[in-house]
Structure formats: C-alpha cells, structure tokens
Amino acid sequence: MSEFLPFSRPAMGVEELAAVKEVLESGWITTGPKNQALEQAFCQLTGNQHAIAVSSATAGMHITLMALEIGKGDEVITPSLTWVSTLNMISLLGATPVMVDVDRDTLMVTPEAIESAITPRTKAIIPVHYAGAPADIDAIRAIGERYGIAVIEDAAHAVGTYYKGRHIGAKGTAIFSFHAIKNITCAEGGLIVTDNENLARLLRMLKFHGLGVDAYDRQTWGRAPQAEVLTPGYKYNLTDINAAIALTQLAKLEHLNTRRREIALQYQQALAALPFQPLSLPAWPHVHAWHLFIIRVNEQRCGISRDALMEALKERGIGTGLHFRAAHTQKYYRERFPTMSLPNTEWNSERICSLPLFPDMTTADADRVITALQQLAGQ
C-alpha cells in the first residue's frame, strides 16, 4: 500500500525552523516583538486598524464575547454547522446560543435566517466564513447595524479569503485561527482584528490577566515592573515562538493558497463526472481560500454512505475529515435543545466529507484520491 495520505498536513520548512531558532537565541521567547510584527502584518493584510494575537481562536472568541458584556439572559445567533467552541464559549458565559440553519448548498448562514432569529435579547451575531469562502457579510453587517447588534465574524477558515475585493476582516471585528490544519499555522494560535479602538484596548487587557501592559511592553518602554490589574483577565497571550512561525507562514500565504486552489480545481474537474456533490460557491464576488474541499455523499445517489466512503478511503490509505457534525446534535446541546430542527444543517451534517487538501500535496496525491472516488462510485 502507498504511504498514508492524511486529510491535512502543515506546510513547514527551513524558514519556520530558522524563525524559531532566531526567537530561541534572542532570549525573549514569550509575547514580544514577533507578536507585535504579526499584529502589524495582519493589519496590513486585512486593512483593519487593530490586531490582537491570542493563544487560539477559541480564546479570541471568549474574550470578544466577554468584552461585549455578553452573559446571562443574552442570546447569540450562530449556525449549528460550526465547530463547537463557539457554542461552548457562549454557554460558559451564561448566554444562550441561538442556532440557525444554513444554505443547503453553500453551507453558509444567510441574512434571512439571522434576521428571523433576532429577539429583544439578541446581543451578538456570529456568521462563519465556511471552508474558505466568505459569507454575505455586507448584508449580515447591515442587519447588525439596523438592530444595534454586534457582529463577530468567525474567520477561522478565512486567511486569504476576499469578499467583494476586500480581505475578510477589513472592517468590523473578525477572529482568525492558526490551528495546525489552517491555511497558515503556528501549531496553535489565533488573532482578532477590529476597527473599534475601545474594544481592542479591552481585548488586550482580557488576554493578559487584565493588565494594562504586558512584560515586553514594560521592559521596552521602561514602565513600572509591576503592572496594574484593571479588570479580571485570562492567560491567552501568544508566545513569540508561535508568532514567529505564523509570520513566516503569512509571508508564504499567496503561494500556499495558490497550491490549495490548484488542488481544488483538480478535484472540481474530476467530480463533474462523479455522483459526489461538492459545495456550491457563493454568488457574490470573492476569492476562495480553499481551507477545505467538501463533498456530500448521498447514499441513494452515490451507492455508498458517507461513513462507508470514509472507511473505504481509509482502507486505501487516504484520510478524510468531517466539518462539522451539527452542534445541536451533540449530546449536551441535544439535551438542552431537544426540539431543535435545522433541516439543511442536518441533511449536510450526515453527508459531508472533507477530502485531503494541503499545500504539500502533489498532483499524484490528488489523482490517487480521485481514482479511489471513481472506484467507489463504480466507475
């Protein structure tokens, strides 16, 4: 059998090793100059005014919700077809996640679904830019402005995603992820961009114990060695080791995403003759980052179930992923919201499968996946 082809693999090279070595030799390995450089670079990428690096996108979501004073009695609208960390953060703050359905073919939350879920208790809206494609964020933001509700963009899949000529996160507030499978990675990490100066100031405090400054800031600017606690906060800062890797990856972003697009195109061309259904692309102008390549496996159409397909691919040495099992079908949320019904989400959650997609894949690797799909489709 050929070597196992994983669903994802980080694209690391000598540049990342050199970046880590530089930090280790500098004597400053925790939050410091590399964090500042990463934040500046993301402001340049997105065009937004403020960037706050954090230890994970989940941490970023937590402190953003906290900074907006979301808590008991509040409601936050979000799709169920998302990673559960968003729902968990809402719930842990005592608020109620209001899960809405997605478009059946793009798997993107729609402005109409969001607006229909708004109540007097709605405090925030969290749309997801899914799989590397952008949600219709202008329309969603217009709803937020009309009702006076904060919009927090889940941009975990959207490093390199453009919407109507602007990078995701160009304005408003958006949260990116640098997890190991993301388009750029530093193993674990995240970053918030915002055009709200007061929110940015509060996020910087909340990510580091509620202090007004961090240790590097105190040393650099000669401030008092013991900072003042201004509000209770967390330990969500990113180390310079991680930030240095992320910076190096960011410099390669165009190359990394170009390779993802090439593989996605190879899949698209092959799937035109197969019964497996890829996602539809959004109708609005955009640049897709191709974080994921997802097919839907309808047993009646394909002659095989999704789970059986994933197992058969595994037997052929090919890894796959599932993004995502609907959050409202998870045990905790199923018991909390037993009557919830989201037909498009549920239909897709039972059929979606993420194919291998990462920059170091070769054309032969993609051909191997395609050949396996052809065989499993009886061709």
Swiss-Prot record:
<comment type="pathway">
    <text>Nucleotide-sugar biosynthesis; UDP-4-deoxy-4-formamido-beta-L-arabinose biosynthesis; UDP-4-deoxy-4-formamido-beta-L-arabinose from UDP-alpha-D-glucuronate: step 2/3.</text>
</comment>
<comment type="function">
    <text>Catalyzes the conversion of UDP-4-keto-arabinose (UDP-Ara4O) to UDP-4-amino-4-deoxy-L-arabinose (UDP-L-Ara4N). The modified arabinose is attached to lipid A and is required for resistance to polymyxin and cationic antimicrobial peptides.</text>
</comment>
<dbReference type="InterPro" id="IPR000653">
    <property type="entry name" value="DegT/StrS_aminotransferase"/>
</dbReference>
<dbReference type="InterPro" id="IPR015421">
    <property type="entry name" value="PyrdxlP-dep_Trfase_major"/>
</dbReference>
<keyword id="KW-0046">Antibiotic resistance</keyword>
<keyword id="KW-0032">Aminotransferase</keyword>
<protein>
    <recommendedName>
        <fullName>UDP-4-amino-4-deoxy-L-arabinose--oxoglutarate aminotransferase</fullName>
        <ecNumber>2.6.1.87</ecNumber>
    </recommendedName>
</protein>
<comment type="similarity">
    <text>Belongs to the DegT/DnrJ/EryC1 family. ArnB subfamily.</text>
</comment>
<keyword id="KW-0808">Transferase</keyword>
<keyword id="KW-0663">Pyridoxal phosphate</keyword>
<dbReference type="GO" id="GO:0009245">
    <property type="term" value="P:lipid A biosynthetic process"/>
</dbReference>
<dbReference type="InterPro" id="IPR015424">
    <property type="entry name" value="PyrdxlP-dep_Trfase"/>
</dbReference>
<dbReference type="InterPro" id="IPR015422">
    <property type="entry name" value="PyrdxlP-dep_Trfase_small"/>
</dbReference>
<dbReference type="GO" id="GO:0099620">
    <property type="term" value="F:UDP-4-amino-4-deoxy-L-arabinose aminotransferase"/>
</dbReference>
<dbReference type="Pfam" id="PF01041">
    <property type="entry name" value="DegT_DnrJ_EryC1"/>
</dbReference>
<dbReference type="GO" id="GO:0009103">
    <property type="term" value="P:lipopolysaccharide biosynthetic process"/>
</dbReference>
<dbReference type="InterPro" id="IPR022850">
    <property type="entry name" value="ArnB_NH2Trfase"/>
</dbReference>
<dbReference type="GO" id="GO:0030170">
    <property type="term" value="F:pyridoxal phosphate binding"/>
</dbReference>
<keyword id="KW-0444">Lipid biosynthesis</keyword>
<comment type="subunit">
    <text>Homodimer.</text>
</comment>
<feature type="modified residue" description="N6-(pyridoxal phosphate)lysine">
    <location>
        <position position="182"/>
    </location>
</feature>
<keyword id="KW-0443">Lipid metabolism</keyword>
<dbReference type="GO" id="GO:0046677">
    <property type="term" value="P:response to antibiotic"/>
</dbReference>
<keyword id="KW-0448">Lipopolysaccharide biosynthesis</keyword>
<dbReference type="GO" id="GO:0016020">
    <property type="term" value="C:membrane"/>
</dbReference>
<keyword id="KW-0441">Lipid A biosynthesis</keyword>
<comment type="pathway">
    <text>Bacterial outer membrane biogenesis; lipopolysaccharide biosynthesis.</text>
</comment>
